[in-house]
C-alpha cells in the first residue's frame, strides 16, 4: 500500500515556478524534511532526505507539495525573508491549486506550510500540512543532486525525471508564465 505522502511524491515532477521573484536557494548538500498534516489527520509525520545543489534545489524544495507536475501558473512573493508561493497545476486533468508559505535561513533550517485544493475530489488529500527542513551535511555516498529518499527507503531521481519530461515533444517548462498553457 502506498502511503499518502509517498503517492504525492511519486507524482511530483515539480517545476520551479516562473515569476519575477525566485524561490529561496538552500545550502547544497543533504536535507531532511519532516512533513506532518495539521489537525486530526491520519497521516503521521514522515521524513524524506533530499540531496541538493544549485541546479536541483528549486525542484526539490517544492517536491513535498502534492500535485506540482504540469504547472501552468505560478507566483512567488518575498517579503522580509518570508515567501508566499501559489501554483496552478494539473494531475491527470485534475486542477490543483497550491498555496505554500516558506521562511527560515535556508542555509541550516527552514519551515513552511502548504494547502492544496483539487478541482475534483481525490482519495488522499492531506489538507493543511506543515514541513520543516534541516541541513544534515554532505550528501551520503551514492546520492546525487536531485535524489530524494522516501520514508520507505525508495530513492527517486526527481531531477532526472524532470529532464526526461522536458525531453518529450511539445513539452514547455512554463517559463513563459503559462502563456501557452492548457489543461
Task: Place the predicted regions along the sequence by residue.
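Intrinsically disordered, low-complexity terminal/linker regions enriched in Pro/Ser/Gly
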Residues: 150, 156-183
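Short, solvent-exposed loop/hinge segments that bridge or flank secondary-structure elements
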Residues: 34-70, 153-156, 160
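Hydrophobic/aromatic beta-strand elements that line small-molecule binding cavities or substrate pockets
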Residues: 48-50, 72-75, 97-104, 114-118, ...
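Bacterial N-terminal signal peptides
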Residues: 4-16
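N-terminal helix-cap/turn-to-beta initiation motif at the start of protein domains
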Residues: 19-29
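Short, cysteine-centered beta-strand-loop-beta hairpins and adjacent loop/turn segments enriched
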Residues: 38-42, 91-96, 118-125, 139
Amino acid at each position: 500500500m502506498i502511503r499518502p505522502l509517498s503517492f504525492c511524491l511519486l507524482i511530483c515532477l515539480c517545476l520551479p515556478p516562473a515569476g519575477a521573484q525566485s524561490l529561496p536557494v538552500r545550502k547544497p548538500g543533504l536535507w531532511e524534511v519532516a512533513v506532518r498534516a495539521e489537525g486530526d489527520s491520519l497521516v503521521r509525520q514522515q521524513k524524506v532526505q533530499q540531496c541538493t545543489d544549485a541546479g536541483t534545489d528549486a525542484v526539490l524544495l517544492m517536491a513535498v507539495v502534492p500535485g506540482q507536475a504540469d504547472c501552468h501558473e505560478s507566483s512567488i512573493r518575498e517579503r522580509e525573508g518570508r515567501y508566499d508561493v501559489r501554483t496552478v497545476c494539473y494531475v491527470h486533468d485534475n486542477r490543483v491549486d497550491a498555496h505554500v508559505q516558506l521562511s527560515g535561513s535556508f542555509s541550516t533550517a527552514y519551515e513552511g506550510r502548504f494547502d492544496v485544493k483539487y478541482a475534483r475530489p481525490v482519495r488522499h488529500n492531506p489538507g493543511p500540512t506543515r514541513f520543516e527542513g534541516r541541513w544534515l551535511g554532505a550528501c551520503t555516498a551514492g546520492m546525487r543532486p536531485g535524489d530524494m529518499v522516501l520514508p520507505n527507503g525508495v530513492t527517486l531521481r526527481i531531477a532526472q525525471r524532470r529532464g526526461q519530461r522536458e525531453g518529450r515533444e511539445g513539452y514547455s517548462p512554463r517559463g513563459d508564465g503559462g502563456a501557452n498553457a492548457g489543461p
